[in-house]
């Protein structure tokens, strides 16, 4: 016979059954005219920047733009268990504050992946940022 209570407790303590909670921050101006299909397709198919989660359960907890009150958004992500924030590929390519946004996310304790779809190096040679949250 299997004691499911012990099995569940074991998996919780060892990280089994854990779902990695992810959020995506998109460039505010781009979001006004983009359906975000590239970001969502990459997430759903676990390709490009999301390939690293191929063998993990993931949940997309937040998907919003980086404008407005970013501190409030980060607090909401934290409250909802997000551990990793992906900055959209358009943020890397079109937002002058890309590096600052990445650092702000890391300072709030999140791991940061600096792109969503396409390559880690953009067509114009810009390399995606990868940061580990500072409070870890």
Each language-model region and where it sits:
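Structural motif
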Residues: 83-84
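Active-site charged/polar residues at nucleotide-handling catalytic sites that mediate phosphoryl
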Residues: 80
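Short, Lys/Arg-enriched N-terminal segments with co-localized hydrophobic residues
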Residues: 1-17
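Conserved mixed alpha/beta catalytic, RNA-binding, or beta-rich assembly cores of soluble enzyme
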Residues: 18-77, 88-97, 118, 127-128, ...
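Flanking helices and flexible, charged tails adjoining ferredoxin-like Fe-S electron-transfer domains
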Residues: 7, 59-61, 111
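Ser/Thr/Gly-rich flexible loops in soluble cytosolic domains mediating phosphotransfer, phosphorylation
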Residues: 100, 104-136
């Amino acid at each position: 016979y299997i004691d499911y209570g012990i099995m569940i407790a074991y998996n919780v303590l060892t990280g089994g059954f854990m779902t990695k909670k992810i959020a995506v921050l998109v460039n505010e101006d781009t979001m006004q005219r983009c359906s975000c299909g590239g970001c969502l397709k990459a997430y759903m198919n676990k390709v490009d920047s999301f390939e690293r989660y191929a063998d993990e359960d993931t949940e997309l907890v937040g998907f919003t733009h980086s404008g407005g009150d970013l501190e409030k958004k980060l607090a909401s992500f934290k409250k909802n268990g997000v551990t990793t924030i992906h900055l959209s590929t358009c943020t890397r390519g079109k937002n002058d504050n890309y590096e600052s946004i990445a650092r702000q996310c890391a300072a709030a304790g999140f791991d940061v992946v600096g792109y969503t779809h396409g390559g880690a190096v953009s067509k114009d040679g810009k390399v995606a940022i990868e940061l580990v949250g500072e409070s870890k």
